[in-house]
Each structure stands twice: as C-alpha cells, then as structure tokens.
C-alpha cells in the first residue's frame, strides 16, 4: 500500500506532547508530530505568547506564519514563573509523553521544569531541547539565528555560485528546519521506540548547528579524497559545472538545469539544438552556449519543450505559482486550514 505522510495521521495517536517552543524550529517540529496524530498542547506565556503571532503580514488575528506551523494543536497560556502555574504544568507533564522546548540552556532548570523535575514526576517523559549550539560546550549561551548556525556549520561557506563573491543566503531557514526540526522529529520517534523497550524516557539535545553540519557528509568525503578543500562556486553541485545551474529565460524568469549524467546532457543538447564537442573552452564554452540558447525562449516555453526530453530541466517557480502547478495540485500538497 502506498502512503504519504498525510496518510499517517493516526500514527502517533495517543502520544501527548507539551510544546513550550516559539518561532520556527520547535513549532515546525510539533506541527509534524501533530500531523502524524499526536495530541499537541502549545503552552504560551500569558503576555506576548509566541512572537510569531505578531509577524507580518497579519489580519485581525495571529499571523499566517503562526497559524501554518501551529495547525492541529491546542493552545493554553501559562506563566511558569508562577508557583501554581508551574505546578499545573508539572501535573500535565505527568500524563505527557514528550515536552519540546527551545529556550537557552538552563532556562528550563531555572523555571523549575527541567529534565530532573520532569523525570521526577514521570520517568517515561521525553524532553527534546532544540538550541543553536547545544546544551553544553563553549557556545551554549550564545544568541544566534539560522544564518549564524549555517555559518559555523560550513553550509553558508559552501553556498553561492560565485567563488569570488560572498556566500549566498537560501530562501528558507535550512538550519532551523533541516538541522533542527527534522533531526528533532527523528530523535523523538527513535526515543519513543526506545522507551517501548526500556520503559524510560530521555533528554534529547538537538543542536541546529550540528544538524546542519551533518548535511556536509559527502563534502567531507571529498575533503578526504582531494588535495584541496572544496569551495563555493567550484564544485559540481554549487556552480562549478555548466550542466548544473540556473539560466535566465527571455521573460526574465529562470530555468533549472540538472543534466549531470551524459545521457541527460545529450538529451538537453539535442532539445535545444547544441552540438556538444570537446573544445579548448571546456565548461566555460558550454555555459556560454546554454546561456545564449536558453535566453531565446520564455521559461514556460522551455518547460513545455524540455518536458518531452527527460533531461532534468524544470522551471524555477515563485511562491504564488506553487498551488496551481500540476505536480502539487495532483499530489494534494496544498489544502485550506479551517478557521
């Protein structure tokens, strides 16, 4: 039977999660857990709550960003600095399976709801702490954002097509999501399985910097094999190869070209009318030819032409085009969240 993640909406049925996190990484993680059927209760402080509520643009209620990553959750307000409210939270933790937090290290302990306090009430509890640099180490108390985690993970230094220019920022928060939320989801699922075996919970230490650094596994393989360290704009997949890049079309939009393998490059050349011959210019000649020929048609014209040639070329879509694209529409990727 074929399933998608949305088909697994009951996989975590019966798992109770208390979510103390704010902004993006923690709420995105608990959104995944909620989508999988977990009962997620978002716990917010009574005054400001989750700062993402106020992110623009917004209408009369919370921002769209907040509503998206906090779907399928219940919400309560609770002041953990108040003795009675803290006790209320600890009583909730007695019946919970998972607690998620994204404070700086030691904040949970100072509030009286750290792992020892939680474990004292419920030895099966799983506490997942998401932070920029980990719960220990020399950077544990430093403030940071996605750009900083990517910088120290080496991901930012590898990003960008211009070897002589500055690193390029991605369009999404790679460390927050790929380095934090996704690794945390995997760790929680593993901890739940391990608890079935041992009967005991655990404290998960998720560093977004380390999670992002783990994405460089193949690059470190290159470091071991090559005499020089890979740099941005020179590698096969980050701008150094003409057959793997982005090219402007006649309407000012862009086409992604990923014709890495010879068969795909051959099909691309045949489709656009290029004759591939080894020459003194090498890759620079190919880049120049592709730049010139792709600029002769619009993005959508090329998309229609190249779709018939199976050559790993696709249009670069903007956000407002995504819901109506045939791929996402037919797969049911987008759906409305009821008020």
Task: Place the predicted regions along the sequence by residue.
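Residue-level detector of beta-strand structural context in well-folded domains
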Residues: 65-67, 204, 245, 335
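Aromatic-enriched alpha-helical interface/lid elements that frame and gate functional surfaces
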Residues: 238-313, 320-321, 326
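N-terminal helix-loop segment corresponding to the beta1-alpha1 unit
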Residues: 1-187, 191-197, 231, 337
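Active-site-adjacent beta-strand anchor residues
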Residues: 79, 101, 206-209, 257-258
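A short glycine-threonine-serine/GTX helix/turn-capping micro-motif
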Residues: 168-179, 201-203, 234-235, 242-244, ...
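Polar, surface-exposed loop/tail segments
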Residues: 198-214, 321-324
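Oxidoreductase and adenylate-handling cofactor-binding alpha/beta cores
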Residues: 153, 180-201, 214-226, 267-274
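Terminal low-complexity tails and localization/encapsulation signals of metabolic enzymes
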Residues: 2-16, 231, 248-250, 270, ...
């Amino acid at each position: 039977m074929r399933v998608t993640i949305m088909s697994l909406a009951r996989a975590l049925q019966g798992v109770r999660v208390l979510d103390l996190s704010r902004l993006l990484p923690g709420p995105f993680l608990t959104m995944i857990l909620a989508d999988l059927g977990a009962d997620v209760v978002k716990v917010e402080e009574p005054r400001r709550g989750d700062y993402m509520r106020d992110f623009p643009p917004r209408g009369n209620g919370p921002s769209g960003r907040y509503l998206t990553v906090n779907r399928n959750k219940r919400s309560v307000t609770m002041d953990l600095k108040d003795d009675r409210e803290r006790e209320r939270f600890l009583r909730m933790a007695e019946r919970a399976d998972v607690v998620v937090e994204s404070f700086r290290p030691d904040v949970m302990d100072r509030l009286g709801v750290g792992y020892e306090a939680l474990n004292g009430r419920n030895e099966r509890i799983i506490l997942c702490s998401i932070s920029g640099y980990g719960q220990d180490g020399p950077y544990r108390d430093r403030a940071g954002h996605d750009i900083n985690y990517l910088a120290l993970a080496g991901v930012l230094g590898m990003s960008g097509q211009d070897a002589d220019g500055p690193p390029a920022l991605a369009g999404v928060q790679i460390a927050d999501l790929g380095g934090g939320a996704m690794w945390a989801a995997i760790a929680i699922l593993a901890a739940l399985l391990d608890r079935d075996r041992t009967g005991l919970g655990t404290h998960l230490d998720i560093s977004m910097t380390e999670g992002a650094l783990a994405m460089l596994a193949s690059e470190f393989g290159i470091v071991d094999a090559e005499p020089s360290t890979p740099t941005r704009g020179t590698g096969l997949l980050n701008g150094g190869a003409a057959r793997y890049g982005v090219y402007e079309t006649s309407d000012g939009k862009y086409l992604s070209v990923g014709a890495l393998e010879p068969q795909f490059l051959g099909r691309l050349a045949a489709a656009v009318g290029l004759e591939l011959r080894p020459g003194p210019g090498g890759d620079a000649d190919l880049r120049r030819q592709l730049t010139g020929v792709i600029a002769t048609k619009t993005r959508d014209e090329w998309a229609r032409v190249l779709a018939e040639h199976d050559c790993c070329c696709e249009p670069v879509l903007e956000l407002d085009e995504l819901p109506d694209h045939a791929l996402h529409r037919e797969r049911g990727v987008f759906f409305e969240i009821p008020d």
